[in-house]
């Protein structure tokens, strides 16, 4: 298995990315291609790691403040070169750089799975149960039609089943109330269409995401990104409040010591790094979009995520799901025959 790693564009430079690759190679067997500035990367690559990786040198990358469309023109940028390597035989790509550039190039260079109108960003959300919830779209498509959300539901269902090994996953539609009549026009129209699928649970509220009421939560990319960023902010704020209160008195410090195991579990379940990155579902190869602020642990987990996606053949599974569950795709196949 060959995994392409975009070294460029992450908030903290190349070091966390290289450290994440090194840690993953200690636990998993895979080949990797690092794409980026060799001069910046070499000081952090040990002789042992150098013997395990291939390095493709380029100094160009798409900066966060640049338009995503720049990636199409910049054929020597790290993400363009990486996407070409993926297209021509590699199995997966991971990037903590410009997410818009990654999404755009993945769609253009790899192509969409047949029947998919819009690829979606899929992210894992912590829940009170033993397994996280899947949320999509988390930001790829701010303006959506009901048909797009149907695609998201099918892809999320298949990802939960194939990659996460959830048995008979249930899909919920994010709304401002669980009743069928709640929601804006997009939600109401999507709800009518989703009723045709056995996996559809119904409408869910924002709080249900973290209760584990359903396995997959579907929404447009605008709402999904707001949910994601709000969750990150709340988790960070709660962590800061805990730290301040623990430091406030000797009694609090002793109590925290007694609850250390519980706090460790809470931290692990709410730490974005433990979830790796966000798969871009709907394109013809596995692409993982990592957070710009990813540390070494986040990159390491993103690699494990990519390996699971490739081993489970999720792209093929989504293709098959669309052929069997989406009427327009199966009808098209019959006409072609």
UniProtKB/Swiss-Prot annotation:
Give a Gene Ontology cellular component term annotated to this protein: cytoplasm
Work out whether the entry's keyword set contains Transferase.
yes
Q: Single GO molecular-function term?
A: phosphate:acyl-[acyl carrier protein] acyltransferase activity
Q: Function of this protein?
A: Catalyzes the reversible formation of acyl-phosphate (acyl-PO(4)) from acyl-[acyl-carrier-protein] (acyl-ACP). This enzyme utilizes acyl-ACP as fatty acyl donor, but not acyl-CoA.
NCBIfam families for the chain = plsX
- Extract the PANTHER family matched here: FATTY ACID/PHOSPHOLIPID SYNTHESIS PROTEIN PLSX (PTHR30100), PHOSPHATE ACYLTRANSFERASE (PTHR30100:SF1)
Q: What is this protein called?
A: Phosphate acyltransferase
Q: Which source organism does the UniProt entry give?
A: Helicobacter pylori (strain ATCC 700392 / 26695) (Campylobacter pylori)
């Amino acid at each position: 298995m060959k995994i392409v790693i975009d070294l460029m564009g992450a908030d903290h430079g190349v070091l966390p990315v290289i450290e994440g690759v090194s840690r993953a190679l200690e636990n998993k067997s895979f080949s990797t291609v690092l794409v980026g500035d060799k001069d910046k990367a070499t000081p952090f690559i040990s002789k042992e790691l150098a013997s395990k990786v291939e390095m493709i040198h380029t100094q160009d990358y798409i900066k966060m403040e640049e338009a995503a469309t720049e990636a199409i023109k910049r054929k020597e940028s790290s993400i363009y070169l990486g996407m070409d390597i993926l297209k021509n035989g590699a199995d997966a790509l991971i990037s903590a750089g410009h997410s818009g550039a990654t999404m755009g190039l993945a769609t253009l260079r790899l192509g969409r799975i047949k029947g998919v109108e819009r690829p979606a960003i899929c992210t894992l959300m912590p829940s009170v149960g033993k397994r996280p919830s899947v949320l999509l779209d988390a930001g790829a498509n701010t303006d959506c039609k009901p048909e797009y959300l149907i695609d998201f539901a099918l892809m999320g269902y298949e990802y939960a089943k194939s990659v996460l090994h959830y048995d008979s996953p249930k899909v919920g539609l994010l709304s401002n109330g669980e009743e069928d009549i709640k929601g804006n026009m997009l939600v109401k129209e999507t709800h009518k269409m989703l009723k045709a699928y056995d996996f559809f649970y119904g409408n869910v509220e924002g709080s249900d995401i973290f209760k584990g009421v359903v396995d997959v939560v579907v929404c447009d990319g605008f709402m999904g990104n707001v949910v994601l960023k709000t969750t990150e902010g709340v988790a960070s704020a709660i962590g800061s409040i805990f730290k301040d209160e623990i430091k406030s008195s000797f009694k609090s410090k002793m109590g925290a010591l007694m609850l250390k195991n519980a706090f460790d579990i809470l931290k692990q379940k709410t730490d974005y790094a433990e979830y790796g990155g966000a798969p871009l579902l709907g394109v013809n190869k596995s692409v993982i979009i990592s957070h710009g602020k990813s540390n070494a642990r986040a990159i390491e987990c993103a690699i494990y995520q990519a390996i699971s996606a490739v081993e489970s053949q999720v792209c093929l599974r989504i293709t098959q799901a669309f052929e069997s569950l989406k009427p327009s795709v199966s009808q098209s196949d019959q006409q072609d025959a």
